Amino acid sequence: MPNTDVSSLSMLGQQTETAQSPEEAVLEKVPSNHAGTDYVVRFTAPEFTSLCPMTGQPDFAHIVIDYIPGEWLVESKSLKLFLHSFRNHGAFHEDCSIYIAKRIVELLDPRWLRIGAYWYPRGGIPIDVFWQTGKPPEGVWLPEQGVATYRGRG
């Protein structure tokens, strides 16, 4: 029988304010009903925003997070609010990208995780950041992230 106990969740089904910083943001988890089965969960945030730590100008990215759960799944509303907490946060692209991945790994201890952060150009240069916890388990269907390389007018 599926584990549907959501009593520990504080945000799902509630009106929730966005944290003022990623450090303050709460990520929540729910039990996986399929622990022991290798499958990929994908979250896509095509309109992620943060601020340049030097100029305060907005930075935009298309972020794709893939993970193979262990015992836990990330609760999606808490992830959405966590990502939104970067909106007024000043950090370099690389720091935002790796921080997101490491917070999820710390919360879930997944079998495997990768992040692809495709940042839109600032100063004429797009920056893409890729990180993963190691090799994925064999035999898992792992789709391409499907985000085209930035081409401008090329």
From Swiss-Prot:
Pathway participation: tRNA modification; tRNA-queuosine biosynthesis
Entry keywords, A to Z: Cytoplasm, NADP, Oxidoreductase, Queuosine biosynthesis
Enzyme class: oxidoreductase
InterPro entries assigned: GTP-CH-I_C/QueF, NADPH_dep_7-cyano-7-deazaG_red, QueF, QueF_type1
Positions with a binding annotation for substrate: 74-76, 93-94
Keyword check for rRNA-binding: no
SUPFAM superfamilies membership: Tetrahydrobiopterin biosynthesis enzymes-like (SSF55620)
EC assignment: 1.7.1.13
Location in or out of the cell: Cytoplasm
Any GO BP: queuosine biosynthetic process
GO CC annotations, alphabetized: cytoplasm
Active-site residues from the entry: 52, 59
GO molecular function: preQ1 synthase activity
Coiled coil: none
Pfam family of the protein (one): QueF
N-terminal signal peptide: none
Family statement: Belongs to the GTP cyclohydrolase I family. QueF type 1 subfamily.
Official protein name in the record: NADPH-dependent 7-cyano-7-deazaguanine reductase
Species of provenance: Rhizobium johnstonii (strain DSM 114642 / LMG 32736 / 3841)
